[in-house]
Amino acid sequence: MSKVKVVERKLGREKAYGQAHQADKIIEIDPRQAGKRYLRTMIHEHFHILFPEMSETEVDKKSASLANLLWKHNYRKVINK
């Protein structure tokens, strides 16, 4: 599998937390999300790229489950300045 590129951009017009572009292997994620929501969105969109045949309901359930597990075990985004 080729690398997935992640691009942060405000997605207010799209009314979305994130978007996955399967053909280009690009995830767009709205950076205005708080910690756990950001993590869940990142996982959710990556699942869309990894498993394009998976239904939205399944992607949502599985991404929520994985995000909850990682969050419970203190996985966080570190911002380097």
Residues covered by each model-derived region:
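Post-HExxH zinc-binding segment in Zn-dependent metallohydrolases
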Residues: 54-81
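Short glycine/proline-enriched coil/turn segments at helix->beta-strand junctions
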Residues: 2, 52-55
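Catalytic zinc-binding patch centered on the HExxH motif and its immediate surroundings
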Residues: 1-28
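Short pre-active-site segment immediately N-terminal to the catalytic Zn-binding motif
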Residues: 21-41, 50
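Walker B catalytic acidic pair
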Residues: 45
